[in-house]
């Protein structure tokens, strides 16, 4: 299968399309055919080495796809289910990837692959900021520094 990989840190020129082998899903894992991927600043941080990752490596944390195969003991999903994720392991810039079932979210029929693949990480971040980092209470005021960005559009309807 084709996968965008990096062998060294740097600019966009270090992104290389390679043919790579993908194994079978192990216990509690699924094989996903990626239909759409999300592009995020953290991908750039990984590519440049600002947030170092072991090399060589695939790149990308966010995708939407269809499960092609399930490993042993998978109980939440089955082949044919449409799912999204925004988490490790890195490697969503690829045709397929293996993911732990616990990292997946079902995608409702009314949401396109493109929307599902680009909103998941931002949605998780919004939930974390508003409910975990500092649980907002009635009357709290919030200053948004980047309301025009993807996260800002979720936080500032």
Where are these regions (language model features)?
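Conserved hydrophobic/aromatic beta-strand scaffold that supports enzyme active sites
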Residues: 17-22, 64-66, 96-98, 104
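NAD(P)H dinucleotide-binding glycine-rich loop of Rossmann-like/cofactor-binding domains
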Residues: 85-146
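Short N-terminal binding/cap micro-motifs at the start of the first secondary-structure element
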Residues: 10-17, 41-43
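Hydrophobic/small residue at the entry helix of a nucleotide-binding pocket
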Residues: 151
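Nucleotide donor/acceptor-binding cores
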Residues: 1, 81, 139-141
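N-terminal Rossmann NAD(P)H-binding glycine-rich loop of SDR-like oxidoreductase domains
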Residues: 148, 156
């Amino acid at each position: 299968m084709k996968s965008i990989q990096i062998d060294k840190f740097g600019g966009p020129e270090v992104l290389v399309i390679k043919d790579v082998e993908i194994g079978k899903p192990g216990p509690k894992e699924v094989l996903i055919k990626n239909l759409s991927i999300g592009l995020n600043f953290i991908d750039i941080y990984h590519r440049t080495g600002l947030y170092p990752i072991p090399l060589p490596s695939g790149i990308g944390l966010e995708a939407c796809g269809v499960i092609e195969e399930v490993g042993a003991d998978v109980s939440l999903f089955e082949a044919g289910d449409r799912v999204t994720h925004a988490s490790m392991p890195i490697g969503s810039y690829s045709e397929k990837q293996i993911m732990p079932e616990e990292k997946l979210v079902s995608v409702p029929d009314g949401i396109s692959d493109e929307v599902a693949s680009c909103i998941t990480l931002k949605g998780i971040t919004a939930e974390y900021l508003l409910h975990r980092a500092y649980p907002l209470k009635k009357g709290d005021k919030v200053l948004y520094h980047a309301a025009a960005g993807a996260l800002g559009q979720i936080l500032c309807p």
